[in-house]
Structures are given as structure tokens and as C-alpha cells.
């Protein structure tokens, strides 16, 4: 199975997001990308939409519920939200939805900043391996992978997807 082209997915996601926001009457959404791949997708999506509003970024490392098991990511950076969260319509963007734990962590962090009017979830890929009841409002594609496979977004320019085989990596 070949992996989809992120640029093609983002073009369709822009169409779908525009329609989703219009149906809900949202005219001034605030975009937030989850580091690192979600920020790249958010930048590409904003460019496709022609939206030049400031982009917020979240690093959810301290909010993850598996922090004690996996430890701290070596490149933790502060979150940056150049706008108020309280009462805003947020578009939360990530690259790959797998367990749902990153999104849960992002929502927890966002609510520490205030109570948004709404949160629209946008994901480039859903790996259909959810452990939590989290589903994107706008999705590029769903992939079904073997238990030992993962997909990684590389970028930021150009964005590309690469398949990783954990069985091969652990054998090295």
C-alpha cells in the first residue's frame, strides 16, 4: 500500500474545513498546531486557505498521561498562543491521530488557557488505532497499518509521509 501525498490531502482538507466552519457559522477561527508535525500541517493548511492570522503552537509533552512511562521528549519547547483562548473558536491541528492521547493532552492544555467556544479537530491521518473516543471533524485519510508499523510526517518543506517498521527497527 502506498502512502498518500500530504499536499493532495491538505488541498481536500482545506475544502472540507472551509465547509465545516461555514456550516457552524465560524468566521474567525484561531488555528493551533501540535508540535511538530501538526504545526507543519497547520502552516500548509493556512496557506491553502489563504489565512494569514497568527498560528498558535502547542507542545503537549507535560500534559501527556504516558509521561511517566516514556519520559520527557528531548526537545520540549514552550507552547505559544498569540491570542486569547477564552470564547474563541479553535481549530486544533495534528499530523497523525493514533491512540488519541496527544489530542487529549492538547485539550487539557488548551483548557488551562481558558474555555474556548468550540474546538474543531483536524488531522492529516487517522491510523484507526484509537484508545480514546476521539475523532477528527476534518480528516485527510484513514490508514490501517499492521501493529508493527507507524507512519511519520517529514518536513516542513516538502511534507512527505514515510512508513516505519518497528519490528525491523527493534531488531537492529
Swiss-Prot record:
Keywords: Glycosyltransferase, Transcription, Transcription regulation, Transferase. Its EC number is 2.4.2.9. It catalyses: UMP + diphosphate = 5-phospho-alpha-D-ribose 1-diphosphate + uracil. It is an enzyme of class 2 (transferase). GO terms for biological process: regulation of DNA-templated transcription. A motif (PRPP-binding) lies at residues 90-102. GO terms for molecular function: uracil phosphoribosyltransferase activity. SUPFAM superfamilies: PRTase-like. The keyword Transcription applies. It comes from the Bacteria. The keyword Transcription regulation applies. InterPro entries: PRibTrfase_dom, PRTase-like, PyrR, PyrR_bifunctional. Belongs to the purine/pyrimidine phosphoribosyltransferase family. PyrR subfamily. NCBIfam families: PRK05205.1-1. Regulates the transcription of the pyrimidine nucleotide (pyr) operon in response to exogenous pyrimidines. Also displays a weak uracil phosphoribosyltransferase activity which is not physiologically significant. This is Bifunctional protein PyrR.
Amino acid at each position: 500500500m502506498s502512502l498518500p501525498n500530504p499536499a493532495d490531502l491538505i488541498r481536500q482538507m482545506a475544502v472540507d474545513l472551509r465547509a465545516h466552519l461555514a456550516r457552524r457559522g465560524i468566521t474567525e477561527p484561531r488555528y493551533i498546531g501540535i508540535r511538530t508535525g501538526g504545526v507543519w500541517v497547520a502552516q500548509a493548511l493556512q496557506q491553502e486557505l489563504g489565512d494569514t492570522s497568527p498560528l498558535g503552537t502547542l507542545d503537549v509533552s507535560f500534559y501527556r498521561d504516558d509521561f511517566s512511562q516514556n519520559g520527557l521528549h528531548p526537545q520540549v519547547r514552550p507552547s505559544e498562543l498569540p491570542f486569547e483562548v477564552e470564547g474563541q473558536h479553535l481549530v486544533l491541528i495534528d499530523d497523525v491521530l493514533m491512540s488519541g492521547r496527544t489530542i487529549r493532552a492538547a485539550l487539557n492544555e488548551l483548557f488551562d488557557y481558558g474555555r474556548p467556544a468550540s474546538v474543531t479537530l483536524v488531522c492529516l491521518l487517522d491510523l484507526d488505532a484509537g484508545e480514546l473516543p476521539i475523532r477528527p471533524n476534518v480528516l485527510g485519510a484513514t490508514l490501517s497499518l499492521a501493529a508493527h508499523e507507524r507512519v511519520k510526517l517529514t518536513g516542513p518543506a516538502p511534507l512527505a509521509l514515510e512508513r516505519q517498521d518497528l519490528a525491523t527497527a527493534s531488531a537492529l
